[in-house]
């Protein structure tokens, strides 16, 4: 006899029932969905047994095609077939059109300058296109697992900025899917390998996908993944290999002024040749022209290696920089994990092995390893595993800070700090009676604001009109597990506050990060000198501002000679402060301080007299 189970409406009668959650690798070229079932993590195939879904969306008069069916039509209808949409996420139309690559799409700009694809279905943005890629993956998962998903973990490149990460979340939101977490792709790979092998030590994650390259150096210790440093390039991947081979084949065949359809056909053939060269020393390429002419040529592995050599070397240079940032050497790296379909290219594996001095790990399909790691994390976050089994510590690639008087940067969260993180610092007002304060949030390693990257600006109003330096404003920087930054400023006595969530409209490539880091080291000595000068100039301005206010109020306490002497020293300080000698400014401030000691004493005496005027000794 079966037991009757009774539960309150809306509550589960089986509190320990397995909750449904999946990991989604939303890739530039292909996307996958994976889940943990009966303790085994695996990618989920569609009804045709295909695990990967081409990240391609075609818009027609009759509807929307996604995946393989869209890919088959891409050569005939390139204008309405959107590929590698991940590259457009969070980027402005100006940024896209200023690049070297020419796209077959018709673009229009949104109100905030972001790209809109003009299609037979109307204007669509990259977020909407991404949602169309997610849709069949979510439907596949729910059909396979037999129920509605309670959440997903979606992977993103480590160098996706806030706008790109938010766009990825928004794509899921359009489908009504709850995003448990955005997970960096290299970190997802570390989860997939780290839990299986239970190793400890330094691990390198070399992730070369269709459109992005990421290198992460992680330390694995007792189940804790700590990302020591990250690097890479958000605009370098297997797509670039395809375009180089496409250009080579076009040159050999002496083809000029290709229409979009023939150009897409040539790109598809270049991709086929690239993949075939993984296991062959040479491959015959062919292309059928509109008039029926069939062109053929043989592409050798040596030719292909020569074409892509510079790009592969660029990834190795990123590895070298990131190791230096992590404070470790290649010899200390125990294992190198290969992620992304482009790591199947023999030259890539050869160069990685030569650099790290050992053969990379490839036991998990490099196309599926990220999705598998995301699924493991989703299973934990949805509550199917104790979270103590795994702890993730990602890092902030560049310092975050606030502009202070004089154009200086006060760093609040240092570079390579693990996230999620919250840091707070107190600031104060510069002028008497100041009731508002403007905040400028910046990113970078330099000492002056002009040399850093501007992220956002906001204003805190309602500060009590107190004397300069009397108000206390607490500024809190909070970076969540998805790398999104929130900045809050609060005046402590009143509780009045203002905040902003930073969503930059432009992406941040690893080239920009590398340049900013190199510039900070190159100009370190100069920057310190400039900072010291700016600090002294700010101090001089503060002293003069304060003294002018004091003279306006109590100047009649001075004799004519005393006033002239102070005015002369103040004028001298103002003149010196306009120069570039920090020591001279500091000395001039000290001289002014000496000349105003008597004035300060007179003000104190006068304040005491006023305070006690009319009071008897007994009351005192």
Swiss-Prot record:
UniProt keyword annotations, A-Z: ATP-binding, Chaperone, Nucleotide-binding
GO molecular function, one term: unfolded protein binding
InterPro entries given in the database record: ATPase_NBD (IPR043129), Heat_shock_70_CS (IPR018181), HSP70_C_sf (IPR029048), HSP70_peptide-bd_sf (IPR029047), Hsp_70_fam (IPR013126), ISC_FeS_clus_asmbl_HscA (IPR010236)
Superkingdom per UniProt: Bacteria
GO biological process, one term: iron-sulfur cluster assembly
A matching Pfam family: HSP70
Keyword Nucleotide-binding: yes
PROSITE patterns assigned: HSP70_1, HSP70_2
Function: Chaperone involved in the maturation of iron-sulfur cluster-containing proteins. Has a low intrinsic ATPase activity which is markedly stimulated by HscB.
Family membership: Belongs to the heat shock protein 70 family.
Record HAMAP family: HscA
Name the UniProt record assigns to this protein: Chaperone protein HscA homolog
Organism this protein belongs to: Shewanella sp. (strain MR-7)
Designated gene of the protein: hscA
